[in-house]
From Swiss-Prot:
This is Elongation factor G. Pfam families: EF-G_D2, EFG_C, EFG_III, EFG_IV, GTP_EFTU. PROSITE patterns: G_TR_1 (PS00301), G_TR_2 (PS51722). The gene is fusA. Disulfide bonds: none annotated. Keywords: Cytoplasm, Elongation factor, GTP-binding, Nucleotide-binding, Protein biosynthesis. It is found in: Cytoplasm.
Amino acid sequence: MANKEYPLAKFRNIGIMAHIDAGKTTATERILFYTGKTHKIGETHEGAATMDWMEQEQERGITITSAATTCFWKDHQVNIIDTPGHVDFTVEVERSLRVLDGAVTILDAKSGVEPQTETVWRQADNYKVPRMVFINKMDKLGADFLMSVGTLRERLHANAVPLQLPIGAEDSFSGIIDLVKNDAVIYKDDLGTVMDETEIPEDMKEIAEEYRTMLLEAVAEVDEDIMMKYLEGEEISVEEIKTALRKGVLANKIVPVLCGSAYKNKGVQLLLDAIIEFMPSPLDIEDVKGTEPTTGEEMTRPADAKAPLAALAFKIATDPFIGKLAFTRIYSGTMKSGTYVFNSNKGKRERIGRLVKMHANHREDVEELKAGELGAIVGLKDTTTGDTLCDDADPIILENMEFPEPVIDVSIEPKTKAGQEKMGIALAKLAEEDPTFRTYTNQETGQTIIAGMGELHLEIIVDRLIREFKVECNVGQPQVAYKETIKKHVKAEGKFIRQSGGRGQYGHCWIEMMPTEGEYEFQNAVVGGSIPKEYIPAIDNGIQEASQSGIIAGYPVINFKVKLFDGSYHDVDSSEMAFKIAGSMAFKNAMSKADAVLLEPSMKVEVVVPEEYMGDVIGDINSRRGRIEGMTPRAGAEVIRAFVPLSEMFGYATTLRSKTQGRGNYVMQFDHYEEVPKSIQDKVIGERK
């Protein structure tokens, strides 16, 4: 089956996305079961689902890395990307959407649209991905299909058009009305493979008629021929409805809504049928855009296996057995194993070791991947997320993906000295896999710092260090990097005299120290040789070393400049060391007179919240010593811009989630340093001592 050649029109590259716990992985499992890829269905709550293949995912029952899987249904090849629903992992969703042609959004029938659904939907809008919705968990207490459809319209402003209605709900959910065919499907067994196609039950004929009329009106909006027939009261065939629906979905004008219970195996085959009938093939989407690496001029590539190669590496993962895997979407051309490709972002040639198609965590080796296919490459050395692979004779750079800056950082150290190098290698590998994770060394404390998108994100990173890389480590509390500066222009003396038999030490200098906006500056204004030239650099060094630890709380001193204007020396006792000490003494004396103050990092914060929570959120920002800069409306929400001290932003993600019922999100980045109020300064000094 897998070796059969499929024409591009019979390819479907789709993502399955949802809020955490809407039943997305379960739905994917059922799809794999019905398409004959798995022989036993894995249950998420037993920790055995095929798609969730990292240990942490099986324990937590959530999906963290998006696994790309190939399966087959009704003579079509379907490539499915399972994406995580937790807010800390939106980067995975962002990457998946970049390489998909269509998406299935799964909602929980008792909750409808949830916060992460909104985030993912906005991301899909950016990439203009055609979508359909599967309302899952119809068998659960509180399941309400029509309420869920309502939330799609109200919260996402989607033109949601039901193609089905459930027969019964909760325990009595027994089948589905197909509004396109105008009949019903009643399930007869637990695996959902035995079903009866029958007439619509008598007690539901009226509501079915009402919703079928709404369906016909929606397709008439996108197809003029149907509009004419509809207005003239002519019969519209099932085929005509399907063709018009497909047209509406591809133009992002219609969002078809289906229902079922993946866990109870109801509605999944109908979902598969709809994916094939209404989701785009690689031929239906626009040719992929890119730029010529040297000239920067825009170019496109068609979805054609005979065209020059253009492929995008959208995820890097490390497999314990075969090493680095680069998950790749081929947009045009053909990639063959054992050949060379050109990485146009890095300007390097790379050799393709093997090409594999993934089924969750099982692999199938293939000789080639063609336009429209998704697969993983083994053997690439320099390729990272977002890189383009192409022919060096026909280079192209596909548009790069933009990833948010990390917003939280903590210090990390190995439990043993021997673990230091091992930890460094492991962190570099993890940073390569995940562009929203950063690692660096704090120059002031020498600590290794890891930064990421949220607390769960960093927890999972630390967890992977322990499990995959066998590095035991201690993790600190999130920290703020304070600085010190001066406010007054002062003069000060530094005099170091040491006489203890034999040769003594003598260094003496006078400096002026003044505040400045820029970097540290040292000016030598000594005239008449009161300090010999060879000792001047020693004074500069002494001042710079002393400035690494200020007099308020021992933080580095910034934004000052020094003018050396006088001093004296001794023919025998003067030395570089003596003048270095004199320089540091002059600096400390000057600082004690110059109104020294503590500075803290001020962050530029943007919060996106639905209007009804705005008052609460603004009040909370003010209570964090925030300064509101402005507000602008954006698609049913408000964007609040403010400057807030970093020390007040710890734990903000959790507060924002609870204040907005999870519907708000925010980004922050460092903007500038500013003076700390006296009361806070005293508190910081107290904590340092």
